[in-house]
Curated annotation (Swiss-Prot):
Record GO terms (molecular function): hydrolase activity; metal ion binding; RNA binding
Origin species: Latino mammarenavirus (isolate Rat/Bolivia/MARU 1924/1965)
Upper lineage: Viruses, Riboviria, Orthornavirae, Negarnaviricota, Polyploviricotina
UniProt-recorded name of the protein: Nucleoprotein
Keywords annotated in UniProt: Capsid protein, Helical capsid protein, Host cytoplasm, Host-virus interaction, Hydrolase, Inhibition of host IKBKE by virus, Inhibition of host innate immune response by virus, Inhibition of host RLR pathway by virus, Interferon antiviral system evasion, Manganese, Metal-binding, Ribonucleoprotein, RNA-binding, Viral immunoevasion, Viral nucleoprotein, Virion, Zinc
Marked site: Important for exonuclease activity: D456
Gene: N
Length: 557
């Protein structure tokens, strides 16, 4: 990370934790499972050999082969790994300005890293430029000192034919750190976990330093195995450095919204990038093109964009090919894409949508059955930045589009379930990823939605790249809006099968407020309030359950 004189490093880290808290997970169980797998399956004689290699003043192609072979073994034993899922981002959920901002930062990051990697034959310069290395050498000579290798984080050792083979072979992995401390330190894994957890708890309020490590080591002797040498760029994952230990500790802390526990999936990648850019603007974060360690924003930007799927901070990434700016690209050539994407050629970037061409065609056909000249209601459940249900309903025909989405913020979801929609997570855990956003992206530009309360709907449309869609807010009072609620539930309640939780009243402690809020039935209820009567038109779904939910069981009649 950059020095405190350049950026308010820890403040940035805290801001990123808050801004990306919806995407953090409880990773402790997964980390310990992989650590046990490594303890049982890894050849620690090979680990010792690689550790010796990393202490050598000059390393050869044979040494690199040992490192890469061991990295492959580690990767094969782990569940927490990053997958090669190259992404091409287009205007949609991310606006043109956001994409340009992202592209600019990736280009700056590329220049920063390439400048730091610039080297003569067989020399890796680490954190210093050639001019800085020469100046340092002159100063040392003038003071009567002989320059020593491995000082100030500089590694000038890789005398190899193909430097590209070094890419993604470094970086610590918490499961590996725990396994090495347990086996090579002859410590009980539980003791190692306790020691690292203390380090992780300290990390929630400050960056732990060597003084902190010394003090914690008195209560946790296992921490004495952590090296006191300053961490450098491209340090091996087998080095028991302070930064590696802190990262491992962060994964073991329950809560704290630690960035290390972020899990990237194809359906939340754009959401994470969007949230990252929001925090960046709020804190005025930037990419510093000067060679050196990455600041918190540079660090998370690189890690997120490297693979597009997996655990960017703590998963194995040694099998990922390419750099962040190669694996995540920005395409500003088109506005909103309504039709199915073109097939991907071999070696090309994958499209971001998790849906197949056939599924995209079903969505397109369903939307085509809505009459854009007639009233169309829209309603959601959950906040606009994390919706769990979407309904689009046309009263004149009874046609409707209805889908669900697994939330990122489970705590907020449970609160919404308790006091509003009554959806249970188990009832929507197999909801199709990416469906809700693709429906919104495929809507034609001329559509005008009718709704009860437009603020959340407009935010939803804005966040999904559809600020062009207009809304009409009926602005009923609460009593007016829900006048026909009981009748509609009696007549059409069979359509609502995913709202099975008990809903409590916020006004009356312990009281039940009656029926949960279902986005589809709410559309019908609001239309009844507008017409003064409940419709006789039978609602007809436009999307099959097999698309709305993955592995939806088929019942033979």
């Amino acid at each position: 990370m950059s020095g405190a004189s350049e950026v308010p490093s820890f403040r940035w880290t805290q801001s990123l934790r808050r801004g990306l808290s919806h995407f953090t997970t409880s990773a402790k169980g997964d980390v310990l499972r992989d650590a046990k797998s490594l303890v049982d399956g890894l050849d620690f004689n090979q680990v010792s050999q690689v550790q010796r290699v990393m202490r050598k003043d000059k390393r050869s192609d044979d040494d690199l082969s040992k490192l890469r072979d061991l990295n492959r073994s580690v990767d094969s034993l782990m569940v927490m790994k990053n997958k090669q899922n190259n992404v091409s981002l287009k205007i949609g959920s991310l606006s043109k300005d956001e994409l340009m901002d992202l592209a600019t930062d990736l280009e700056k990051l590329k220049r920063k890293i390439n400048l730091g990697d610039r080297q003569g034959p067989g020399v890796y310069q680490g954190n210093l430029t050639s001019a800085q290395l020469e100046k340092r050498s002159e100063i040392l000579k003038s003071l009567g000192f002989q320059p020593r290798a491995n000082q100030n984080g500089v590694v000038k050792v890789w005398d190899i034919k193909n430097p590209k083979l070094l890419i993604n072979q470094f970086g610590s992995i918490p499961a590996l750190t725990i396994a090495c401390m347990s086996v090579q330190g002859a410590e009980q894994m539980n003791d190692v976990v306790q020691g690292l957890t203390s380090l992780g708890l300290l990390y929630t309020v400050k960056y732990p330093n060597l003084d902190d490590l010394d003090k914690l080591s008195k209560d946790h002797p296992c921490l004495e195995f952590i090296t006191k040498e300053e961490s450098a760029n491209n340090i091996s994952g087998y080095n028991l450095s302070l930064s590696a230990a802190v990262k491992a500790g962060a994964c073991l802390v329950d809560g704290g919204n630690m960035l290390e526990t972020i899990l990237v999936k194809p359906d939340n990648f754009q959401d994470i990038v969007k949230s990252l850019l929001v925090v960046k603007r709020q804190e005025k974060m930037f990419v510093n093109e000067k060679p050196g360690l990455r600041n918190p924003y540079e660090n998370i930007l690189y890690k997120l964009c490297l693979s597009g799927e997996g655990w960017p901070y703590i998963g194995s990434r040694s099998q990922i090919v390419g750099r962040a700016w190669e694996n995540t690209t920005v395409d500003l050539s088109k506005e909103v894409v309504y039709g199915p994407s073109a097939p991907v050629k071999n070696g090309g970037n994958m499209r971001l949508s998790p849906l197949s061409d056939t599924q995209e065609a079903v969505i397109k056909e369903a939307i085509g059955k809505l009459d854009m000249d007639e009233t169309i209601w829209i309603d959601i459940e959950g906040p606009p930045n994390d919706p769990v249900e979407l309904a689009i309903y046309q009263p004149s025909t009874g046609n409707y589009i209805h889908c669900f989405r697994v939330p990122h913020d489970e705590k907020g979801f449970k609160n919404g379930s308790k006091y509003s929609h009554g959806i249970l997570l188990r009832d929507i855990e197999n909801a199709r990823s990416g469906l809700l956003s693709r429906i919104l992206m495929r809507l034609p530009q001329k559509v005008v939605f009718t709704c009860q309360g437009s603020d959340d709907i407009q935010k939803l449309l804005q966040m999904n790249g559809r600020p062009d869609i207009a809304t009409i807010d009926m602005s009923f009072s609460s009593e007016q809006a829900r006048f026909f609620e009981g009748v509609v539930w009696e007549k059409f309640g069979h359509l609502c099968t995913r709202h099975n939780g008990v809903v409590l009243s916020r006004k009356k402690k312990g009281g039940n407020s009656g029926e949960p809020h279902c986005a589809l039935l709410d559309c019908i209820i609001f239309q009844a309030a507008f017409e003064g009567q409940v419709t006789g038109q039978i609602p007809k779904p436009l999307l099959p359950n097999s698309l709305i939910f993955k592995d939806e069981p088929r019942v033979a009649m």
